[in-house]
Amino acid sequence: MTFSVQHAEIHFNQNHIPVSDQFDDVYFSNENGLAETDYVFLQGNQLWERWITHKEANFVIAETGFGTGLNFFAATKLFRKFRQQHENHPLKRLNFISFEKYPLKITALSQAHLACPQFEDLSAHLQRYWPSLILGCHRIHFEETTLDLWFGDVSENLPQLGDYMNERIDAWFLDGFAPSKNPEMWNDDLYNLIFRFTKPNGTFATFTAASAVRKGLESAGFNVTKRKGFGKKRECLSGLKIQSKSTALSTPWYLAQPAKMEKQDFAIIGGGIASLCAAISLVKRGAKVTIYCEDAALALNASGNKQGAFYPQLSDDNVLTVDFYLHAFSYGRQLLDWAIEQNIAFEHEFCGVALCAYNEKSAVKLTKISQLGLPNEIFQMLSAEQLSEKVGLPLNCEGGWIEQGAWLAPRQFVQNAFSFLEKQGVIIKTAQKITALSQEEKGWELKNMQGQKYCHEVVILANGHKITDFVQTEKLPLYPIRGQVSQIPTSENLLKLKSVLCYDGYLTPANQLKTSHCIGASHVRDNVDRHFSEQEQQENQQKLQQNIAQPWTQDVNTSDNLARVGIRCSVRDLAPMVGNVPHFEQQQAGYYNLFNLRRRKQPIQSAVNFQNIFLIAALGSRGLTSAPLLGETLASILYGEPLPISEGILHNLSANRAWVKKWLKGSKVE
């Protein structure tokens, strides 16, 4: 498996229009690209008129070729105008999904945007967050619009929208290079998928009027109309989906199901990074959020360390887990930038992360990572000399270098970000241990230890290893892991450490006061004791000194016995969980014979979940990296919006995945 994507090879013609060398075709009209976009795509899909009559909170556009982003800019600016003129309209958000096989280099993108100064603000934001060359979905937030930019071949990526996106897309911009130049893209499989994902009464528009395209879209099920073409083109096509076709779900046991709600009233149980990130994504959608934290203050458990590393987990044997972390890393950096822009104060340093090949096993893992085809800013192998230069201290081994890695202060980040959200209307209730959940007529009733009751439409469980304390979740295969992080004083040598250093543990650079470092962490499964352990304190020191056999490591001194213990939540396959809370008894009844149902090709029901209970769980030791994308994914599911992850990743993060894997093999689940 490789995640690499190839850049577009282009040149600019005499009209300053970008031209693809791969397809020998212009990115937009030589005459007036913006006018062409307006006529072919915006008017062709009757966007303004449809927005006026739209009854839902979001509208979804999908596009088959992002190119320079001109169509996206034009649609976003039109939607901005619509929102300004219709502030109280139910339509609040625009989701824009676009596929691009050959992304432009940032320099070419910047040059192409010079032709459209009216989009300067959108262009600057896009260029700031232009993704690294990694296969898959990259979500970028704009004020009015959410852009899901899928890098890679549309024929491979479009199916990854999956069962969840059946009949969820309102309009299509069928762009990309001309069918005569790019015949591989324009095919019946594409047309059938487009029809499948289009809502009833959804539309498409395209610049081409090629007979094969028209016939293919008609065969897929669209009513196709010829329109006058733009400029010198005689004709173009638009179409309408009038009748649906029944489509069998490919994986009904993993189908994500949105919340059923009227008031957007959410309770989030938990006071750490998972709760925070879910709350941020919900508040951006206008939700009413109440936080229930059992501790006296927020971020007192696994999210409470003074320093934590921010980097992706790339050494997993499951490629879907690696895929998730790559995109979580990119999205998480975007969230950190947002927090900084909001003046949310937290110590941090974008200093890079070094992964040491401290033994044969770790060297093999790093070699595997180096074969994933990742861009250098995400991962590159360096010699011991090169890595030592990055780290600032001598190392005796080669290793991996994550240029965009960082450290930050988790407790500061969580507490101060929640203070920011309080000003946005989020209600925070501390010292509130919720002991039971019961479904009532008006929603879910939450009962605390004192017998007080609260009622909310939707409940999100994000309380770490205590998620399984509830009847609804007690069967989930989660377990606690005790972790002790040591705090050590700095020294003249340790002050030279310029990046996070990872081995069979980790060591952070000095904090911003230049007084101390964090070193950790112990890993004790099925242990929830939060008392200090002298043995684990010594082990934290010994791991560094054994793995990195250099004189400077003798400066590490844990004898002050300053440490902090947190209890993390994990699962055997080490991937997090997000989405619906599965109803074990009903899924067991429906799927215990799943192996034979599939073999006999018999009908299989969709997964039965607890209505309006959701979770974010099993973040393990990578919560700083994974929580932002998990929170955004959950919010997208809750609101029935497009997801920022592929169907394959979603399945890999589903809470019932361990059960399903057994049922699919004909094995029992106890």
From Swiss-Prot:
Task: Report the InterPro entries cross-referenced here.
Answer: FAD-dep_OxRdtase, FAD/NAD-bd_sf, MnmC-like_methylTransf, SAM-dependent_MTases_sf, tRNA_MAMT_biosynth_bifunc_MnmC, tRNA_MNMC2, tRNA_S-uridine_synth_MnmC_C
Q: Which Gene3D superfamilies match?
A: D-Amino Acid Oxidase, subunit A, domain 2, FAD/NAD(P)-binding domain, Vaccinia Virus protein VP39
Q: What is its EC number?
A: 2.1.1.61, 1.5.-.-
For the region FAD-dependent cmnm(5)s(2)U34 oxidoreductase, what residue ranges are annotated?
269-670
This entry's Gene Ontology molecular function terms read: flavin adenine dinucleotide binding; oxidoreductase activity, acting on the CH-NH group of donors; tRNA (5-methylaminomethyl-2-thiouridylate)(34)-methyltransferase activity
Q: Which UniProt keywords apply?
A: Cytoplasm, FAD, Flavoprotein, Methyltransferase, Multifunctional enzyme, Oxidoreductase, S-adenosyl-L-methionine, Transferase, tRNA processing
Q: What is its main location?
A: cytoplasm
- Tell me, which GO biological process terms does this entry list? methylation; tRNA wobble uridine modification
Give the protein's cofactors.
FAD
Catalytic activity from the UniProt record: 5-aminomethyl-2-thiouridine(34) in tRNA + S-adenosyl-L-methionine = 5-methylaminomethyl-2-thiouridine(34) in tRNA + S-adenosyl-L-homocysteine + H(+)
The UniProt family comment states: In the N-terminal section; belongs to the methyltransferase superfamily. tRNA (mnm(5)s(2)U34)-methyltransferase family.
Q: Which NCBIfam families match?
A: MnmC_Cterm (TIGR03197), PRK01747.1-2 (NF002481), PRK01747.1-5 (NF002484), tRNA_MNMC2 (NF033855)
- Describe the task this protein carries out: Catalyzes the last two steps in the biosynthesis of 5-methylaminomethyl-2-thiouridine (mnm(5)s(2)U) at the wobble position (U34) in tRNA. Catalyzes the FAD-dependent demodification of cmnm(5)s(2)U34 to nm(5)s(2)U34, followed by the transfer of a methyl group from S-adenosyl-L-methionine to nm(5)s(2)U34, to form mnm(5)s(2)U34.
Q: Tell me what this protein is called.
A: tRNA 5-methylaminomethyl-2-thiouridine biosynthesis bifunctional protein MnmC
This protein's species is Haemophilus influenzae (strain PittGG)
User: Lineage, please?
Assistant: Bacteria, Pseudomonadati, Pseudomonadota, Gammaproteobacteria, Pasteurellales
